[in-house]
From Swiss-Prot:
InterPro entries: Ribosomal_Su5_D2-typ_SF, Ribsml_uS5_D2-typ_fold_subgr, RNase_P, RNase_P_CS. Belongs to the RnpA family. This is Ribonuclease P protein component. It comes from Shewanella sp. (strain ANA-3). Its EC number is 3.1.26.5. The gene is rnpA. Coiled coil: none annotated. Keywords: Endonuclease, Hydrolase, Nuclease, RNA-binding, tRNA processing. One of its GO terms (molecular function) is 3'-tRNA processing endoribonuclease activity.
Length: 118
């Protein structure tokens, strides 16, 4: 049976892991969200999130955005190639509803997969 959990091994945890993604990434972006990714040696994708206070002032809003993105990753992890992915949130995402964020991030997962495979 397929597991849809978001365990510790599916996260980027250390600054070194984040830094490696920024070195020479594959990019997929929209006006509000950018995905940066590099291939990893694991058998699964890993996710790191950054939601800057500069763009989203309130903590509850930052947490909401991270929760929606994590949930989308959790449900789509088996369709995403073995990549280390960092999600950067920019200005404008705070005004979006959860469903809009989810739709946008799923579109970006597909775009990233195409760029990696194609």
């Amino acid at each position: 049976m397929t597991s849809y959990t978001f365990t510790r091994e599916l996260r980027l945890l250390t600054p070194a892991q984040f830094k490696s993604v920024f070195s020479n990434p594959i990019k997929a972006s929209s006006a509000e969200i950018t995905l940066l990714a590099i291939p990893n040696s694991e058998q699964h994708p890993r996710l790191g999130l950054t939601v800057a206070k500069r763009y989203v002032k309130r903590a509850n809003q930052r947490n909401r955005i991270k929760r929606v993105i994590r949930d989308s990753f959790r449900l789509n992890q088996h369709d995403i190639p073995h990549l280390d992915i960092v999600v950067l949130v920019r200005n404008g995402v705070m005004e979006m509803e959860n469903a809009e964020i989810n739709k946008l991030i799923e579109k970006l997962w597909r775009k990233l997969s195409r760029r990696y495979n194609g």
